[in-house]
Amino acid sequence: PAWVCNKMNNALDADWFRGLGAGESAGQFTVELPQGWQTVETPVQFPVCKDRTPAWVQYVQSRRLEVTCGEAPFLASRYDAATGEMIPVARRIGILDRKLRVVSENAATEDEWRKYATHAVQSTYGYEYQGDNLLLARVNLLLTYAEHLQARWQRKPTKEELQPIANIISWNLWQMDGLHRSVPGGKPQPEAEQLDLFSMFGAAEPQPPTVSCKVKNWRKGSHGTAQNFETIQEGSTSMKFDYVIGNPPYQ
């Protein structure tokens, strides 16, 4: 349900804002209600970061991943996945929705909006095993971008504007077997064999290599750099994402 996604996304944001030393009044997108929420209509408050990238830009660029994402209800809340009921843009609580709300509240011009809205999409990731679910997730993210642009600037995006966004989404939402971190079927399963006295001491047959998934690291190169999922990291750490979320017990 969307109210569960809101509650869990709120927990991520509360942790993120605490990391900046922000007060309790900062970072409030919604007020939680029993099986629901009320949108905070005033602009989201961010702490002042002296001699650093503005806090709102850091938030927009924070990497977040939804695992086994299905239709991506944690990333984009165009509708309540439990009921199918559409959610107005102003009430949406998905990770990308929150990033785009922050961009709309802080970007002074349309060019600035498109720049940081692109950063928002670039830092929003998800993977899914089932191809049909993955298609729905990609469509949801693309329409989320389009609907936020229309809500802010009272116009629909052009095909030329949507093309690079669609390309980013096609990289950032990918098909993967999360248990083996490979493309579906990319890790061959050993066949059951009948053991005998002689084969027990023979050399094991070599297994074909696992077929890894490639994901774009948009912070490397002017158009991003394709890397194996396992090798994406930030600096000298092995951390790929600031936050990982998904249906319990994956959060």
Model-assigned labels for residue ranges:
Residues 1-251:
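SAM-dependent methyltransferase catalytic region
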